[in-house]
Design a protein with these regions (language model features):
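Charged docking surfaces used in two-component/phosphorelay signaling
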Residues: 14-22
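Signal-transducing coiled-coil linker helices
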Residues: 93, 107-143, 151-162, 212-213, ...
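Conserved nucleotide-binding and Mg2+-coordinating catalytic segments in signaling enzymes
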Residues: 136-155, 176-190, 198
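Active-site-proximal structural segments of metal-dependent nucleotidyl cyclase/transferase enzymes
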Residues: 154-188, 204, 215
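Hydrophobic framework residues that shape the active-site pocket
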Residues: 181, 200, 214-217, 222, ...
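Catalytic core regions of nucleotide second-messenger enzymes
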Residues: 216, 245-262
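Catalytic-core segments of nucleotide cyclases and related cyclic-nucleotide turnover enzymes
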Residues: 235, 268-300, 305-321
Length: 323
C-alpha cells in the first residue's frame, strides 16, 4: 500500500521512511504541508498519511483541515505526529481531522500497529463504496440484460429532452419489441428466452453510440434514446438494429433460435417540442403499425399518431407510470 510521509526534519524523515519501507509500504515523501497536499492531489492511491504537526508553509493541523474540507472519497487515513503531549493538543489534532495521534519520539511497533488499524479502516471504507455502487447499479439496471431499467431510461430521456430544448437539438426515441417472443419461450423454454433477451440487449447496445441510452422496459420491450439525432437518422439506426437482430440466430444448448424485432421511431424534429410520454406513445404507435405491417421492420411515427397522442396526453399525467 502507498503511504505519504510528511515531515520537515531530515533525520526523522529518513528514520520513518526506513521503517515504513521495511514494513512493505511504498513511501512518498513531503517536506512541508503544501507539498503533502499536492502529493495527495497528484496520486489518489495515497490513502495513508503520516504527518508532522510542526512544518513550514502549512502545518499538520492545516493539512488535516484541508483534507477533511475537500473531497471525502477516496478517504485518507491520517496519523498526526508531534512532540506535543498535552491532552488539549491531542483533542485539537483529532478535532482538525486526524484519525490517530502519536507522540514523538515514535515507538516503531506502536506506529506499525496504528497504521495496520488505519489499513483496516481504509479496506472497510472501500467495501462500503463498492457496496453502495453495486446497490446504485442494481437500482438503475435490469438484472437480466444489464441495460437501464424502465425508471432509469425514462429519467435519461427526460434529461435529454431538457438539454435538447436548450440547444435546439433533436432527440429520437426508438421503441422495440421482439417478434413472436412468446413462441420462443413456449418452444425452447424460458432459459432460452432469457438468452435471446440478453443477446438482443447486447446487439442493441452495440448498434448505437456510446452516449446513447438503451433500456429494457419489461418483458421483450426495449427502448433507445438517441440525443442529437433527427427522425431520418433515427429511422436509419432503427433499420440497422432490425437487421442486426434478424441476421444471426442466437445459439442456446446446441440450438439456433431465430429472432427479430419491430421498432417504432418518434423524434422531436417531427413534431416540435414534445414531452417524454408523448414521444414514447408516438413511437409505440409506430411500433404497433410495424407489427401489423409484417414485423421485423422499423417505421416512423406519423402526424396523425402524434395528434392522437397529444389528445390523450391532455388527460394524463406528464410522466410515464412505472408499470
Amino acid at each position: 500500500m502507498k503511504i505519504l510521509l510528511a515531515d520537515d526534519e531530515p533525520i526523522v524523515r529518513a528514520m520513518l521512511e526506513h521503517w515504513l519501507a521495511g514494513w512493505g509500504y511504498e513511501v512518498t515523501l513531503a517536506r512541508d504541508g503544501e507539498s503533502a497536499l499536492q502529493a495527495l492531489k497528484d496520486d489518489p492511491e495515497l490513502r495513508l498519511l503520516v504527518v508532522d504537526w510542526v512544518m513550514p508553509k502549512k502545518d499538520g493541523i492545516e493539512v488535516c483541515k484541508a483534507i477533511r474540507n475537500g473531497p471525502q472519497e477516496p478517504y485518507v487515513y491520517i496519523v498526526l505526529l508531534t512532540a506535543k503531549d498535552d491532552k488539549s493538543d491531542i483533542i485539537a489534532g483529532l478535532d482538525a481531522g486526524a484519525d490517530d495521534y502519536l507522540v514523538k519520539p515514535c515507538n516503531p511497533l506502536e506506529l506499525k500497529v496504528r497504521l495496520r488499524a488505519g489499513r483496516r479502516v481504509i479496506e472497510l471504507q472501500e467495501q462500503l463504496v463498492k457496496a453502495r455502487e453495486s446497490l446504485r447499479f442494481e437500482a438503475m439496471h435490469d438484472g437480466l440484460t444489464g441495460l437501464l431499467n424502465r425508471g432509469a431510461v425514462i429519467e435519461q430521456l427526460t434529461k435529454e429532452l431538457v438539454r435538447a430544448s436548450r440547444r435546439g437539438a433533436p432527440v429520437s426515441v426508438l421503441m422495440g419489441d421482439l417478434d413472436h417472443f412468446k413462441s420462443i419461450n413456449d418452444t425452447h423454454g424460458h432459459a432460452a428466452g432469457d438468452a435471446v433477451l440478453r443477446e438482443a440487449a447486447r446487439r442493441l447496445k452495440a448498434g448505437v453510440r456510446a452516449y446513447d441510452n438503451v433500456g429494457r422496459l419489461g418483458g421483450e420491450e426495449f427502448i433507445c434514446v438517441l440525443p442529437e439525432c433527427d427522425a431520418k437518422t433515427g429511422l436509419a439506426v432503427a433499420q440497422r438494429l432490425c437487421r442486426s437482430l434478424s441476421e444471426t440466430p442466437t445459439k442456446f444448448s446446441g440450438t439456433e433460435i431465430a429472432h427479430s424485432i419491430s421498432i417504432g421511431v418518434a423524434a422531436t424534429d417531427q413534431f416540435g417540442s414534445a414531452r417524454c410520454d408523448e414521444l414514447m406513445r408516438a413511437a409505440d404507435a409506430a411500433l404497433y403499425r410495424a407489427k401489423h405491417a409484417g414485423r421485423s421492420r422499423a417505421l416512423l411515427a406519423i402526424e396523425k399518431e402524434f395528434e392522437q397522442v397529444k389528445e390523450v396526453s391532455q388527460t394524463l399525467p406528464a410522466s410515464i407510470p412505472a408499470e
